[in-house]
């Protein structure tokens, strides 16, 4: 599009621009219906193309906003040919994290978020809130490298600590600093949470949600091998091989003590481990207890192909409309030749006409894209 506009500008400088524009507006007046159909057809094609490409880009860049995303891995349990699961127990995760110096940091996240009811006190007045919270171990801030606006990557080290997304902090505390403020639970048996940090909101295409992250109790299921209820992520050193990390763990971990004397890694009725890079988790399917957003690479490839087919069809349509008008425009073109217009000027006017119609259709499609999210047709939950 930009190349076409640039080319037309160069051509126009060498041609009679006044004549070209006069011919262009004359065509619009004479063939109003055809011009409107051309513009609408192209603009709808542009809208469809851009909407599809936005979705494709959304999924292909999922979790790419995290620094060193390719060095972050989720550890899944594989049950032979029976499938796999995304959750793990805390002592197993602790043993894995400490098994190799190649693992820079590890963290656990509860498999599901929960709603928390709390209130804050300000000048003797109580204001109640209900917000989603995710119970995590302190290492989450270092594995995923939260962009901390207040506080640091050690903000969850102490019990009853929480970090808030910027949007939530502004909603609750306005322009005041949130650090040090208490979130008092509606449950009198639960200790108040203390805000220790504020992080910049994650983009929508991230597995991490813009919720309150609460520090997991150090005693919670610490040695409980029967509670498999956590997502487990590790961050490896730059250039480290995940296969080497897995082999090292399997060689040194006393699996028989944990799972029984008959346990063997990778056996049909036994367990195995799988490390999946953070961006690939989005495309990993058929994993039990995996509540993270999913997409299919095959579906995205189909969408990508459809987007370009739409553009090609729109181009063919545009050409057909222009060709259909040729018999009605022959007289006008011959008249211009008689009046002295050169072939170059006539070709230039046709080129300007095509580019102007395309440019106007493109601008109209941008207007449609601006309006669509404000209509009931837009899916607010997407």
PLM segments and residue spans:
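Membrane-helix entry/capping segments
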Residues: 2-9, 13, 17-21, 26-34, ...
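Small-residue-rich transmembrane alpha-helices
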Residues: 47, 274, 355-382
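Mid-to-C-terminal secondary-structure elements
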Residues: 1-5, 9, 134-150, 162-295
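Selective detector of the "anchor" transmembrane alpha-helix that sits immediately C-terminal
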Residues: 300-321
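Generic structural signal for small/hydrophobic residues in well-ordered secondary structure
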Residues: 28, 38, 59, 75, ...
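Hydrophobic membrane-insertion alpha-helices, especially the h-region
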Residues: 39-53
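Intracellular coupling helices
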Residues: 21-37, 41, 314-357
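Structured, solvent-exposed hinge/loop segments at the ends of secondary-structure elements
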Residues: 49-179, 186-194, 247, 259
